[in-house]
């Protein structure tokens, strides 16, 4: 074992030498005191969690999960094909199909699995398919496209002109699919969705949109950016997550009956794994239903996002300007990014996880701030002041958002 241990040790040491070693923070979240948590016996404010609207602690969602737990027990009992096709997950899929105005939906154990296994399976169903994928697509999309072994073209980030050039190079009668995200999680930029839809129609391509960072948050009923733009019906496959705005766990796709059924019968990431337990499916269904009916959380969320960005501008904190709720602060150095994160936590009681390579390109290391409706004006002010002090201590330049945005945008798409 010592021979192999040496290999693993060298690999870890290399990561440490590059300032990329990840240490997970031990947290005790507080359902009755969101967005606070306990860390090292101290109360902290969380500014980096994906529970965007705090739905994991919503009274309706918690009560629904308690009721389901007492009624059905903890586990699902098996795969969907063998004992695990519980009524709760069927109700969830019906709710998701309705959310996106599609004929059918299919639930997976995570958003990663939904992307990975669906995209790879499309190539099994259509062996001649060609993928067109944005260069900054999520690792789950990259994994699915890569494991499909299908022909692929990677277009420059958000560049529809480059996408069209690539589409033109492929026979119009050959199966093809454009894969993109509605909002990119590390920079917060929105895709030009309607332009991509138009190109798909022009060149006879399917469209696959990842809405994981936008479902629940945008649109009249929480259907994401596609619903906001009133174009859900023009997108062939909408993929999303239950683990962010909806506050639970799991991923899904929605589309027409035949496509969803084909994936159900083909995707190994769906077939060969235990299904979501009823306690989770029921909680997710109630979360979706609530956010279909209530705009209160979305309105408050956008108010906090605006206040946070305004505060950063007032303090000259160099965040990456975008139209979304994701607020990245580019540090550009892995050591300083880690130091800033640790100082925020240990000195100021503020938890913001730093993001380093391989999640983001080298030289674009960052802090990613995630506002929620529960963040107060005082929390925003405390965070802003803490960042100013930390930037001074670490010799990180305060610069205008406009200048930084242009500089980093070039790095992101180079």
UniProtKB/Swiss-Prot annotation:
Protein biosynthesis is among the record's keywords: no
Q: In which pathway does it act?
A: Porphyrin-containing compound metabolism; protoporphyrin-IX biosynthesis; 5-aminolevulinate from glycine: step 1/1
| Active-site residue list | 244
Q: Which residues carry this modification: N6-(pyridoxal phosphate)lysine?
A: 244
Q: Name one GO molecular function term.
A: pyridoxal phosphate binding
Q: What is its EC number?
A: 2.3.1.37
Q: Which reaction does it catalyse?
A: succinyl-CoA + glycine + H(+) = 5-aminolevulinate + CO2 + CoA
Q: Which cofactor does it need?
A: pyridoxal 5'-phosphate
Record-annotated residues binding substrate? 22, 133, 152, 359
Please list the disulfide bridges: none
| Record-linked InterPro entries | 4pyrrol_synth_NH2levulA_synth (IPR010961), Aminotrans_II_pyridoxalP_BS (IPR001917), Aminotransferase_I/II_large (IPR004839), AON_synthase_class-II (IPR050087), PyrdxlP-dep_Trfase (IPR015424), PyrdxlP-dep_Trfase_major (IPR015421), PyrdxlP-dep_Trfase_small (IPR015422)
Q: Which GO terms describe its biological process?
A: protoporphyrinogen IX biosynthetic process
What general EC class does the enzyme of this chain belong to? transferase
Q: Which residues does the record give as pyridoxal 5'-phosphate binding sites?
A: 185, 213, 241, 273-274
Organism's domain of life? Answer: Bacteria
* Pfam families in UniProt: Aminotran_1_2
Entry keyword set: Acyltransferase, Heme biosynthesis, Pyridoxal phosphate, Transferase
- NCBIfam families of this UniProt entry? 5aminolev_synth
Q: Which PANTHER family match?
A: 2-AMINO-3-KETOBUTYRATE COENZYME A LIGASE, MITOCHONDRIAL, CLASS II AMINOTRANSFERASE/8-AMINO-7-OXONONANOATE SYNTHASE
Quaternary structure (record): Homodimer.
Give the protein family: Belongs to the class-II pyridoxal-phosphate-dependent aminotransferase family.
Instruction: State the protein's name.
Output: 5-aminolevulinate synthase
Q: Which organism is it from?
A: Rickettsia felis (strain ATCC VR-1525 / URRWXCal2) (Rickettsia azadi)
Annotated gene: hemA
């Amino acid at each position: 074992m010592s021979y192999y241990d040496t290999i693993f040790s060298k690999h870890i040491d290399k990561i440490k030498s590059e300032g990329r070693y990840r240490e997970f923070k031990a947290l005790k979240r507080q359902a009755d005191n969101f967005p606070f948590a306990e860390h090292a016996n101290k109360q902290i404010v969380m500014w980096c969690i994906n529970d965007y609207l705090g739905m994991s602690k919503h009274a309706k969602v918690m009560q629904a999960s308690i009721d389901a737990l007492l009624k059905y027990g903890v586990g699902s009992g098996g795969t969907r094909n063998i004992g695990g096709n519980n009524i709760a997950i069927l109700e969830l899929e019906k709710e998701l199909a309705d959310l996106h105005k599609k004929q059918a939906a299919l639930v997976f154990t995570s958003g990663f699995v939904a992307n990975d296994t669906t995209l790879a399976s499309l190539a099994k169903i259509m062996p001649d398919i060609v993928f067109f994928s944005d260069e900054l697509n999520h690792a789950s999309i990259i994994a699915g496209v890569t494991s499909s072994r299908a022909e692929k073209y990677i277009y420059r980030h958000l560049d529809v002109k480059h996408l069209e050039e690539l589409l033109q190079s492929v026979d119009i009668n050959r199966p093809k699919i454009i894969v993109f995200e509605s909002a990119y999680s590390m920079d917060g930029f929105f895709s030009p969705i309607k332009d991509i839809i138009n190109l798909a129609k022009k060149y006879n391509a399917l469209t696959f949109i990842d809405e994981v960072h936008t479902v629940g948050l945008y649109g009249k009923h929480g259907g994401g950016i596609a619903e906001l733009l009133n174009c859900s019906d023009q997108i062939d496959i909408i993929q999303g997550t239950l683990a962010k705005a909806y506050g639970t766990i799991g991923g899904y796709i929605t589309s027409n009956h035949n496509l969803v059924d084909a994936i159900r019968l083909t995707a190994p990431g769906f077939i060969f794994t235990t299904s979501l337990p009823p306690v989770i499916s029921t909680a997710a269904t109630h979360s979706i239903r609530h956010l279909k009916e209530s705009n209160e959380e979305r309105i408050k969320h956008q108010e906090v996002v605006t206040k946070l960005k305004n505060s950063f501008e007032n303090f000259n904190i160099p965040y990456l300007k975008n139209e979304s709720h994701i607020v990245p602060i580019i540090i550009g150095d892995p050591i300083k990014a880690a130091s800033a994160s640790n100082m925020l936590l240990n000195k100021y009681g503020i938890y913001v996880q730093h993001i380093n390579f391989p999640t983001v390109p080298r030289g674009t290391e960052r802090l990613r701030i995630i506002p929620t409706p529960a963040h107060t004006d005082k929390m925003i002010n405390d965070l802003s002041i803490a960042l100013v002090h930390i930037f001074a201590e670490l010799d990180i330049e305060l610069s205008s958002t406009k200048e930084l945005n242009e500089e980093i945008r070039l790095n992101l798409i180079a």
